[in-house]
Each structure stands twice: as C-alpha cells, then as structure tokens.
C-alpha cells in the first residue's frame, strides 16, 4: 500500500503533505491568491522542467541514437517517451499561463495592465509577455510539428525535415526566454 508505487498515489500524497504543512503551520487563512500562486509555480516547474529535459536530454539523445549505426535508434523514445512528455508539456504550459493570468487579476494588477506594462506592472507584465510567447510556441509551433515528427499525423519526408527545424527553433526560443 505504498503510495509511491504509482504516479497518482505520489501526486495525491504530495497534495496531502502540502495540506498537512499548511495546517501544521497554522495557516488557516488560505487565500485564493496563495492557491493560484502555488498552482502557477507547480505547473511552471513541470513546464520548464520538461522544456529543459527536451533541450538538454532528449534532443541530444535522439541525435546520438540516429548517429549510432547498429544501435537501437530513437524509436522507443519517439514512440513511448516523447508523446507522454509532450502531453504534460503542453497542458502544464496552458495551466501555467491560466494560473498566471488569474493571479494577476486576484492581485489587482489585471492582465490588461500587465500586458500594457502600466506603472507598477511592468516587470510582471514582461513575464506575462514572455509566458504568452512561450505558450504560443508550445501550442502553435512545437506541438503541431512534433505530431509530424513522431508520426502522429501523416507527413512527407520534406514536411518532417521542416517540422524538425521549426520545433527545434521554437523550443530553443522558449529555453532562451525561460532564462
């Protein structure tokens, strides 16, 4: 009955532990803002963690696998790992953006003021712009092109070659913006 034997059990246990910590510290006045920030940070950790995994681990590993004559090749990564990682990647990106927008509203800054870089909102507004560009890259450039690369949608060899370039540049742009 070890909850750590499944990812669902681990996640549920993490939520229970977080609740116990909050209660144990006597933080009975949990705020909407605090919950929004917590979800924003958690989703952001998943999103950027996967972004770094793709850029620092998976892309170089697939390149090495393709160049290893007689080796196993990248088929297992492309069939089993990449689709699951991309699922978490794109939905954590959306959740990060949505919780960030909600937090701006709850804080009283407002998403409009943030995007217009109004006084008192310029720094967080730049973050909102960077996050929006990154979200666009995930859903409009990276994911549709990864579907071609992974064979989820039909594409010619030329389309796949082009998709690899677009997905890589969008992913590298997101890595740059995340720093």
Residue ranges and their predicted role:
Residues 1-179:
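Polytopic transmembrane helical bundles with strong interfacial aromatic enrichment
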